[in-house]
Amino acid sequence: MPEIRVTPLGAGQDVGRSCILVSISGKNVMLDCGMHMGYNDDRRFPDFSYITQSGRLTDFLDCVIISHFHLDHCGALPYFSEMVGYDGPIYMTHPTQAICPILLEDYRKIAVDKKGEANFFTSQMIKDCMKKVVAVHLHQTVQVDDELEIKAYYAGHVLGAAMFQIKVGSESVVYTGDYNMTPDRHLGAAWIDKCRPNLLITESTYATTIRDSKRCRERDFLKKVHETVERGGKVLIPVFALGRAQELCILLETFWERMNLKVPIYFSTGLTEKANHYYKLFITWTNQKIRKTFVQRNMFEFKHIKAFDRTFADNPGPMVVFATPGMLHAGQSLQIFRKWAGNEKNMVIMPGYCVQGTVGHKILSGQRKLEMEGRQMLEVKMQVEYMSFSAHADAKGIMQLVGQAEPESVLLVHGEAKKMEFLRQKIEQEFRVSCYMPANGETVTLPTSPSIPVGISLGLLKREMVQGLLPEAKKPRLLHGTLIMKDNNFRLVSSEQALKELGLAEHQLRFTCRVHLQDTRKEQETALRVYSHLKSTLKDHCVQHLPDGSVTVESILIQAAAHSEDPGTKVLLVSWTYQDEELGSFLTALLKNGLPQAPS
């Protein structure tokens, strides 16, 4: 029996280093190839030894798919392709292809040039890795080989993020990557059609969270920022270069303009220009409002937000700084945090999820004394706020996507075990489907029922709609047609269309039953008696007496003939097509009971 096997190499009951191995009908696909931001040793990369114990990875894997440019989804890609050794195709969207190498190089500089880490990929490896990338458009069906095809759907979350459908024959898996079911200030909501996959693999970062009103969150955020700068404090907002950063920049830019504020707002050097360039380049990936107003006003050209210089961190007076990366695990955001942490006037606002092991996660867990590099202790006196502007789906959004895609089974990744367990039970109760949540290295095997996809001709559907009411969503309805196979594809069409397409002439199959009737009259008179009897009995049917003496009821033909041996007996020949078998049988039984006596 065919089956689908799924093994998380990363993000199994965990957030970070997303990497899922899927085997479907003999094809092997790796979904994402991320890095764990909470580790600085080999644990940061997925354990690729699970893929194959012998032979080259390229011989085993048919392709790699990257859902978006966040490092926990693509950070291990150069390591995997250039150091572990994979030469096959890597699929991602055009924005992901453009932005991914920039973020990889930024992180490499921090890890190697500043921290001096060994066993890390080089700049050349990033370039060589990106040469293997095949960029895809949304809703484009890409044929990886003769049997394997993939298709990308809009995921929201960040610029270029996509959900992917992987299909082999009639079997399919949908992998969501990270997605957001609610539109924000610069991106639209995730969308997928009712594709009914065998398996939906969905992220579950916020498995137990239902977010409050976005407007309330925005109001609280602006209030906290405003109050801090009013009392002379500095606000640090750690963000990743693209995505949430633009969302909050648009929000603050609008507020500063409305309130006519003069307090400086800064953004990590160079990243604003890069972000601006990519949002212009991929404007079709943004939401409808930004696309509409883009010609008159580019929302990403900020008047109040300037490029940050590291010397500004020591300037007196209030300021707001957006700095990367978003989890305070390295880079400029961590440097500024160390400088400002000792002043209670200052505030750090964490707008997104932080994985375990990062400074961001530690301060959100309430730690106020941190051991930094070189065993230095840092006392945190500044105010710490968590405000979820995360571009991940919450529990309500995850349930919405499951309802939209209608999968046969669901598998949860990219979440914390306890929260995943709660969501797993909820999905099983509400949708009556099996839901799994494997740990890293654990394999889930799903048997699948082979099915044959059948297309239905538009003409047949239109005819059905004219003849009857529209089908109800949850009530099955019979559809009559002719099943034809052409070029290895099955289609249900009308019989007329089937004959035309296959070049066949129409033949009619009729059944004839003989009914013996005691009657001494002539054949014409017997036929007239039959007509009168049926006309009075069958009020809802069209009964006709034809000039040649025969009688018809709908398509059923009745003829009276003399008996060859008994002059006092007539033979009624009742003839019908297979479509009217039910009516033909009824008339035969009725006539076998005889005709009413004619008045004398």
From Swiss-Prot:
Q: How is it modified after translation?
A: Sumoylated; sumoylation regulates its subcellular location and is required for integrator complex integrity.
**Annotated GO MF terms:** RNA endonuclease activity
What keywords are assigned to this protein? Answer: Cytoplasm, Hydrolase, Isopeptide bond, Metal-binding, Nucleus, Ubl conjugation, Zinc
The UniProt entry, under InterPro entries, shows: Beta_Casp, INTS11-like_MBL-fold, IntS11_C, MBL, Metallo-B-lactamas, RibonucZ/Hydroxyglut_hydro, RMMBL
Activity regulation: the record says:
The RNA endonuclease activity is inhibited by BRAT1 that forms hyrogen bond and hydrophobic interactions with the active site.
Give the coiled coil ranges: none
Q: In its keyword annotation, does this UniProt entry include Cytoplasm?
A: yes
Residues binding Zn(2+) 2: 72-73, 178, 414
Give one GO biological process term.
RNA polymerase II transcription initiation surveillance
Summarize the protein's role.
Answer: RNA endonuclease component of the integrator complex, a multiprotein complex that terminates RNA polymerase II (Pol II) transcription in the promoter-proximal region of genes.
Q: What is this protein called?
A: Integrator complex subunit 11
What is the source species?
A: Rattus norvegicus (Rat)
